[in-house]
């Protein structure tokens, strides 16, 4: 019986879809014949070297063992056929030609490090996903500079404005913006193949950059030490998701304060914070939001004092910190 994944293209974006293909191929291999895998026709077929015989019209996929809506984000799913996966997931000549026509950044530097910053939808679902903080990227970039002094960083993101604001001051960094006059599929693949062409990687907790790094076969990959939050982290264990040779780095805050079980979103005037323990909602004004972000993010105590004393020369911000503490919105780091 054939092994299928009928939901391909309808359950997550490109990174998730690559895991679904790899996992299904792995299951078919374990069942006796990798060629028994079958998928519905796929928007990204022209960009990868997966043989066309694996794809058929959706209504032709019948009497199969189907993967349902499993994400299959587990190296063990395709450990029996990793060489085949690497071969199938290499870019076609068409993919490379199109990417080069949309991005001018190929082969402009002797050594390049791809930096992928995933923000976008993650900002709205903090219970499941942590947005990698700025210090994760800056510290990882410094590691790469020490190892590869000539490297040039290509930063790709779904939030290029944030990246320009935080990285544009560095002369060895280029923030890559999405190509104009490209379809969504063309844009996704141009960015993916530009990333994949790099020599080293600093990835977010994103399957998109995971596959760019993995399929490049680079030995120089820095990745977050934590991928998901809460219950989701037990469903996709980090130990079976990340290759052993990738260098894991913390994405935990380095500020002097920690947050308890809070959900944080952005309102018109400041942060809206929901305490999941009491379900109480706190609306912070702009100055309280600034202090909350500084104390729980990528800033040392000295950084916080310097910034807040510039904003509030009369030292009045200290009472604001006490208010955050009394409300239980922050607590001292241990």
Located regions from the model:
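Long, low-complexity, charged/polar intrinsically disordered regions in eukaryotic proteins
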Residues: 250-279
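Long, charge-rich, low-complexity alpha-helical segments
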Residues: 277-334
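N-terminal pre-catalytic "stem/leader" segment of glycosyltransferase-like enzymes
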Residues: 1-39
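Short hydrophobic beta-strand segments
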Residues: 1-9, 34-37, 110-121, 154-155, ...
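Secretory-pathway luminal glycosyltransferase catalytic domains
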Residues: 4, 40-148
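Donor-binding and catalytic core of enzymes assembling or modifying cell-surface/extracellular glycoconjugates
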Residues: 10, 14, 148-240
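Leloir-type glycosyltransferase catalytic cores
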Residues: 91-97, 231-255
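Short amphipathic alpha-helical segment that frequently serves as the phosphate-/nucleotide-binding helix
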Residues: 17-22, 134, 138, 288
């Amino acid at each position: 019986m054939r092994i299928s994944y009928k939901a391909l293209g309808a359950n997550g974006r490109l990174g998730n879809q690559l895991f679904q293909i790899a996992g299904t191929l792995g299951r078919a291999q374990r069942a006796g014949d990798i060629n028994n895998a079958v998928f519905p026709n796929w928007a990204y077929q022209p960009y990868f070297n997966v043989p066309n015989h694996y794809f058929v019209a959706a209504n032709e996929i019948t009497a199969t063992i189907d993967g349902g809506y499993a994400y299959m984000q587990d190296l063990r799913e395709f450990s029996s056929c990793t060489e085949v996966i690497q071969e199938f997931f290499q870019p076609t000549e068409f993919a490379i030609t199109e990417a080069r026509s949309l991005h001018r950044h190929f082969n402009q530097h002797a050594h390049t490090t791809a930096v992928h910053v995933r923000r976008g939808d993650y900002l709205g679902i903090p219970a499941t996903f942590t947005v990698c903080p700025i210090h994760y990227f800056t510290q990882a970039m410094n590691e790469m500079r020490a190892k590869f002094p000539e490297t040039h960083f290509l930063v790709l993101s779904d939030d290029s404005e944030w990246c320009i604001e935080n990285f544009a001051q560095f002369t060895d960094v280029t923030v890559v913006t999405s190509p104009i006059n490209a379809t969504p599929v063309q844009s996704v693949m141009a960015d993916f193949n530009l990333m994949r062409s790099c020599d080293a990687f600093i990835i977010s907790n994103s399957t998109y950059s995971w596959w760019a790094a993995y399929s490049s076969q680079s030995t120089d990959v820095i990745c977050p030490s934590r991928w998901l939050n809460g219950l989701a982290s037990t469903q996709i264990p980090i130990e079976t998701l990340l290759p052993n040779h990738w260098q894991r780095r913390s994405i935990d805050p380095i500020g002097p304060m920690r947050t308890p079980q809070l959900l944080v979103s952005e309102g018109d005037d400041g942060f809206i914070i929901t305490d999941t323990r009491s379900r109480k909602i706190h609306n912070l004004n702009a100055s309280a939001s600034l202090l909350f972000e500084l104390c729980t993010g990528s800033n040392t105590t000295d950084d916080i004092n310097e910034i807040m004393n510039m904003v509030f020369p009369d030292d009045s911000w200290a009472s604001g910190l006490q208010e955050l503490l009394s409300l239980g919105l922050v607590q001292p780091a241990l």
